[in-house]
């Protein structure tokens, strides 16, 4: 009588399977905000405030770029003032 034994062999993974993730990346910094403070001297063309949308409005002698950046049109002193319903505008006063 011939007896054949069946061997039950189970192989396990030698390396763990690696799943994918949807995290692990970040956007580059945009460096938004005030570049010149109230009372500071600004030359013509210098950036006063970088923003997304009109958080701060342009006043006298201040230009508004197409990305809503505020810049000085003339040499002078930067002046931030409140107006209307909790809004802020920035002007440049000639020195």
Swiss-Prot record:
The residues of the propeptide are 1-12
Which molecular function terms from Gene Ontology are attached?
structural constituent of ribosome
Q: Superkingdom of this entry's organism?
A: Bacteria
- What's this protein's name? Large ribosomal subunit protein bL27
Q: What are the BP-aspect GO terms?
A: translation
SUPFAM superfamilies per UniProt: Ribosomal L27 protein-like (SSF110324)
Q: Which Pfam families match?
A: Ribosomal_L27
* Classification via InterPro entries: Ribosomal_bL27, Ribosomal_bL27_CS
Q: Which HAMAP family match?
A: Ribosomal_bL27
What's the family?
A: Belongs to the bacterial ribosomal protein bL27 family.
Gene of this entry = rpmA
Q: Which UniProt keywords apply?
A: Ribonucleoprotein, Ribosomal protein
Region feature Disordered, mapped onto this chain: 17-37
The record's annotation in PROSITE patterns points to:
RIBOSOMAL_L27 (PS00831)
Modifications made to the protein after synthesis: The N-terminus is cleaved by ribosomal processing cysteine protease Prp.
**Does the entry feature the keyword Ribonucleoprotein, yes or no?**
yes
PANTHER family listed in its UniProt record: LARGE RIBOSOMAL SUBUNIT PROTEIN BL27M, RIBOSOMAL PROTEIN L27
A single GO cellular-component term from the record reads:
cytosolic large ribosomal subunit
